[in-house]
């Protein structure tokens, strides 16, 4: 891929991307990091999309990099007081711009805490998903008490929980962005949301 900064555009999911998103959701490397590892059928996927369209507390964006769909970023209302959004994401394509995961982190913080005015951005990560835990640490999320325990493949794991308060992001943003590779900081200027 080209080394110049990509345009990272986040567009609400439409029926046009449904088949592609189902392919992504069913990829083993994506399913293994979800609460449920079950393969999703087309009927289940359509029912999920119908429910999503009628639920104002959730939004689901397709992540376009230079007009090519490569992943998703989603939000749901975690609680109303204080207004807290929970987020999740994944990249479904292999050949993406280096640092795309970092751009998802930045986009999530910008959308929730700047565009939507949430007081808190909340995240849950399965304890074996070390790369995402590392990203949240790099971005200075506040770790919370661990969530529920669960077993997968005979091993015990926990749900790691994190939050980021709006005032914390306002204070930390310049420092966090300055610690990232220069090409990532530059690419952060090209994050767009189709609202």
Locations of regions flagged by a protein language model:
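Acyl-donor (CoA/ACP) binding surface of acyl/acetyltransferases
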Residues: 2-20, 24-27, 67-195
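An amphipathic alpha-helix signature
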Residues: 15-22, 42, 46, 50
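Residue-level marker of structural boundaries
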Residues: 27-30, 39, 54, 141
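Conserved GNAT-fold acetyl-CoA-binding loop/helix
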Residues: 29-47
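A short helix-loop-beta-strand connector motif used in the catalytic cores of GNAT acetyltransferases and
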Residues: 50-62, 71
């Amino acid at each position: 891929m080209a080394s110049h900064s990509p345009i990272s555009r986040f567009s609400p999911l439409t029926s046009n991307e449904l088949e592609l998103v189902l392919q992504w959701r069913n990829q083993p490397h994506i399913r293994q990091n979800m609460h449920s590892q079950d393969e999703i059928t087309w009927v289940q996927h359509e029912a999920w999309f119908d429910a999503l369209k009628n639920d104002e507390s959730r939004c689901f964006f397709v992540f376009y990099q230079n007009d090519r769909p490569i992943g998703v970023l989603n939000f749901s209302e975690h609680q109303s007081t204080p207004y807290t959004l929970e987020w999740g994401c994944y990249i479904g394509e292999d050949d993406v711009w280096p640092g795309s995961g970092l751009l998802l982190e930045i986009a999530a913080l910008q959308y929730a805490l700047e565009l939507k005015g949430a007081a808190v951005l909340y995240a849950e990560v399965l304890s074996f998903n070390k790369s995402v835990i590392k990203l949240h640490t790099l971005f200075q999320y506040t770790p919370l008490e661990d969530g529920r325990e669960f077993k997968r493949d005979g091993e015990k794991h926990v749900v790691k929980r994190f939050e980021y308060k709006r005032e914390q992001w306002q204070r930390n943003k310049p420092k966090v962005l300055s610690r990232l590779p220069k090409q990532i900081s530059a690419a952060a200027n090209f994050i767009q949301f189709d609202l």
